[in-house]
């Protein structure tokens, strides 16, 4: 099963994933034309700001199995396509915007936006669909393609988990001083961004204390 794997420690909150997602789900598939579309295309991934400046978490649908949203939908608008049964999709024409799916979603990733596919372009439940149309064309999800720091990866879930597990094992080795900490360094641009955010956060905290 393929999925989008998130490395929150690498996210710098640049929101490139959000922009790419919105464009991928626009009518024109073009950044410069998408901003003039009605309704304006919206992202299905949300890079939320963390507690410390310059830290963020790219939150998106996890495509749960079983999916609580699918179970409570009274109109069967939420379903799994035959060719990609691991993906949970929403049919805009069947959605009545009752909000039940958003209420039961444990990750708060279902939002309501106007859709060109909905009757009268009304607001309907909207969430990540793993860029199913792109996958059908042999492409990876737009958010993964846009991420420049490796915070989002796409692939077989077991392989991605194994890679992450190996990394955590290396972290334990570093803590025991068995290997150099250099192997665990984040990309220079990520570390610099996080250091800047931490420094500004400390300055703001000192200012509040009157230091």
Across the structure, where does each feature detected by a protein language model lie?
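Short, flexible active-site loops
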Residues: 86-89, 126
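Flanking helices and flexible, charged tails adjoining ferredoxin-like Fe-S electron-transfer domains
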Residues: 32-63, 94, 102-211
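Ferredoxin-type iron-sulfur electron-transfer modules and their immediate structural context
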Residues: 1-77, 81, 86, 94, ...
């Amino acid at each position: 099963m393929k999925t989008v794997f998130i490395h929150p420690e690498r996210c710098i909150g640049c929101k490139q994933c959000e922009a790419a997602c919105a464009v991928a789900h626009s009518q024109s598939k073009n950044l410069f034309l998408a901003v003039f579309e009605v309704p304006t295309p919206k992202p299905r991934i949300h890079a939320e700001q963390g507690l410390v400046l310059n830290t963020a978490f790219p939150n998106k649908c996890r495509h749960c199995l079983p999916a609580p949203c699918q179970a409570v939908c009274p109109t069967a608008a939420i379903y799994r396509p035959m060719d990609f049964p691991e993906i949970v999709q929403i049919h805009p024409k069947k959605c009545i915007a009752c909000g039940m799916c958003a209420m039961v979603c444990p990750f708060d990733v279902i939002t309501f936006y106007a859709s060109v596919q909905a009757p009268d372009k009304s607001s309907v439940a909207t969430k990540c669909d793993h860029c199913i149309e792109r996958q059908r064309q042999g492409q990876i999800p737009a958010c993964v393609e846009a991420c420049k720091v490796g915070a989002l990866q796409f692939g077989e879930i077991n392989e991605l988990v194994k890679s992450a597990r190996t990394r955590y094992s290396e972290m334990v080795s570093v803590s025991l001083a068995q290997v150099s900490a250099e192997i665990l360094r984040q990309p220079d641009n990520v570390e610099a961004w996080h250091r800047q955010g931490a420094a500004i956060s400390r300055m703001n905290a000192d200012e509040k204390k009157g230091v």
